[in-house]
Amino acid sequence: MSLHSPGKAFRAALTKENPLQIVGTINANHALLAQRAGYQAIYLSGGGVAAGSLGLPDLGISTLDDVLTDIRRITDVCSLPLLVDADIGFGSSAFNVARTVKSMIKAGAAGLHIEDQVGAKRCGHRPNKAIVSKEEMVDRIRAAVDAKTDPDFVIMARTDALAVEGLDAAIERAQAYVEAGAEMLFPEAITELAMYRQFADAVQVPILANITEFGATPLFTTDELRSAHVAMALYPLSAFRAMNRAAEHVYNVLRQEGTQKSVIDTMQTRNELYESINYYQYEEKLDNLFARSQVK
């Protein structure tokens, strides 16, 4: 694969920042905003695709094609490496997992995480989760690794076992997943900082901490996560939640006041939007490329 492969870029980012802050980008515009803010890697949440693109809950309803559409839109305009939530692999067989891996590589993703929940999955921070056997998840990991067409594409294992089977069993599963070929680990819904260190010591691969709001995991700081040997800090829906609250407020104000004057100062200006999407460069190219056709 080329030196500019997304997977290689993601691995390089891990060496430059500790922990690597990875922010969720719900769409291509947000990916560009994250890039302008100086982030080195971005994320596409499965729950974000469901809620943001489809208006549906994160209950395994989204399809692979739904996710691929959003991946392509982001990677078409943003050069930051994109980590993608692949849920359980979008199907019950190893061939489904393999197709997911190959398709995401073609779409420009840097890596994915695949989890050990059952097909009727739930949000990782909701109660009543159910997980497959350790052996079935190992098969998912093996299928994902075997399907890689880019050796630098990242296969990350997510385990939801802590809430279902307890810490010791979750660590045992994590070790099996790494032995099967997972290169990084995402232990979901961690409740204590020290647990991250226990996972890190047990598996000796980079650990991702999901610092999502309003869930089971406290909002640990990057300093705290670094002390626990966490390599990646993920903020999957932070900007999306803020965007939704801002939109809701503007809609209500417009409805109640009949004008947007009282909220205009909270808005991104036209010029700021144009700068974030490189509008002026496109316009200049348009003028240069098609100037002759405009002369009558």
Swiss-Prot record:
Pathway this chain belongs to: Organic acid metabolism; propanoate degradation
Cofactor entry: Mg(2+)
InterPro entries referenced in this protein's UniProt entry, alphabetically: ICL/PEPM (IPR039556), Isocitrate_lyase_ph_CS (IPR018523), PrpB (IPR012695), Pyrv/PenolPyrv_kinase-like_dom (IPR015813), Pyrv_kinase-like_dom_sf (IPR040442)
The protein's name in its UniProt record: 2-methylisocitrate lyase
Binding site for substrate: 45-47, 123-124, 158, 188, 210-212, 241, 270
Catalytic reaction annotation: (2S,3R)-3-hydroxybutane-1,2,3-tricarboxylate = pyruvate + succinate
Function of the molecule: Involved in the catabolism of short chain fatty acids (SCFA) via the 2-methylcitrate cycle I (propionate degradation route). Catalyzes the thermodynamically favored C-C bond cleavage of (2R,3S)-2-methylisocitrate to yield pyruvate and succinate via an alpha-carboxy-carbanion intermediate.
Subunit record text: Homotetramer; dimer of dimers.
GO biological process terms held by the UniProt record: propionate catabolic process, 2-methylcitrate cycle
Annotated source species: Escherichia coli (strain K12)
UniProt superkingdom: Bacteria
Gene: prpB
Family: Belongs to the isocitrate lyase/PEP mutase superfamily. Methylisocitrate lyase family.
